[in-house]
From Swiss-Prot:
Disruption phenotype: Prevents vacuolar accumulation of autophagosomes and affects survival during carbon starvation. Belongs to the ATG8 family. This is Autophagy-related protein 8. The record marks 116-117 as: Cleavage. It holds the Pfam family ATG8. It comes from the Eukaryota. Keywords: Autophagy, Cytoplasmic vesicle, Lipoprotein, Membrane, Protein transport, Transport, Ubl conjugation pathway, Vacuole, Virulence. It comes from Mycosarcoma maydis. Conjugation to phosphatidylethanolamine (PE) leads to homodimerization. Interacts with ATG1, ATG3, ATG4, ATG7, ATG12, ATG32, ATG34 and the C-terminal 10 residues domain of ATG19. Also interacts with the endoplasmic reticulum to Golgi v-SNARE protein BET1 and the vacuolar v-SNARE protein NYV1. Interacts with the UBX domain-containing protein SHP1. The keyword Lipoprotein applies. GO terms for molecular function: phosphatidylethanolamine binding.
Length: 118
């Protein structure tokens, strides 16, 4: 999935912003969260998040659920590099493993446990 954030901002601008954020908030992780293509789940109101490094993926999913006001019976899945990360994994570990060359961690969310087409 191509990130809309990447399309809207140049690499240099994104890299400079991520570096500035990491210097100012060394214990936080800059995350870009966008809705996956072809899902009927609501669109999130903001894409940029500064998450504590000790936050788990499960806790981050909870934050996303609240932001999109998702009904409790509806499922939500988040993907990093088209992979479903473990719920108990720390966002700092996911960041170190999957951060983009611009310094942001790109996360997409969907109402289905699939990525792309079948």
């Amino acid at each position: 999935m191509r990130s809309a954030f990447k399309n809207e901002h140049s690499f240099e601008k994104r890299k400079a912003e991520a570096e500035r954020i990491r210097q100012k908030y060394p214990d936080r992780i800059p995350v870009i969260c966008e809705k996956a293509d072809r899902t009927d789940i609501p669109t999130i109101d903001k894409k940029k998040y500064l998450v504590p490094s000790d936050l788990t993926v499960g806790q981050f999913v909870y934050v996303i659920r609240k932001r999109i006001k998702l009904a409790p019976e509806k499922a939500i899945f988040i993907f990093v590099d088209e992979v479903l990360p473990a719920t108990a994994a720390l966002m700092s570990a996911i960041y170190e493993e999957h951060k983009d060359e611009d310094g942001f961690l790109y996360v997409s969310y969907s109402g289905e446990n699939t990525f792309g087409q079948l």
